[in-house]
Amino acid sequence: NFGLGISIFQEPASLDNYKKALEIAFAEDTAVLVEEFIPGTEYRFFILDGRCEAVLLRVAANVVGDGKHTIRELVAQKNANPLRGRDHRSPLEIIALGDIEQLMLTQQGYTPDDILPEGKKVNLRRNSNISTGGDSIDVTETMDSSYQELAAAMATSMGAWACGVDLIIPDETQPASKENPHCTCIELNFNPSMYMHTYCAEGPGQAITSKILDKLFPEVATNQN
């Protein structure tokens, strides 16, 4: 549905926070979809022609305290990383401190001007999208093959030859099975981002675009071979 994952509440929201979340959401569109919260860790599987080519662990926008700087200052420090930019022109996106992030801080009992204790991690978003300041970690080589096969089957069932499959997995050490998949699919993205798999904050990264080009222009790929 091309949703933005605007506000996510792990615990039941107060009426005031719920109203604020709706206010923020309706500023983006004329309709809002409210979905059930699914606990676990989110992974993006990139599927091409029925095969999993990459798996990404996306970590929500966050800062870690040093006992000296405010949350606002920590965000500025993190945004100084040359890997971060705007409008999808860099591997990672700038972290904002807008209404959504401040609502998230309020839920945790913080304000942007609070100083976090050393080592204290605070999330600024519930959703782990790279486009909202999240971090990308390539876990293709370590993700159990059962989940890769399941994600590929989901994309194939929808007739999508290129697809991003988002799975929430509570415990990735427990293999998926037909009887118990041990995961929940929260999205099938038919226009998946590729650069985040190649230029990761951590991990080796996976070359995706060249395989897409080979698919679209097989005559060129054949000539090169």
Where on the chain are the PLM-derived regions?
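C-terminal active-site "lid" helix and adjoining low-complexity regulatory extension at the edge
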Residues: 135-142, 156-162, 169-225
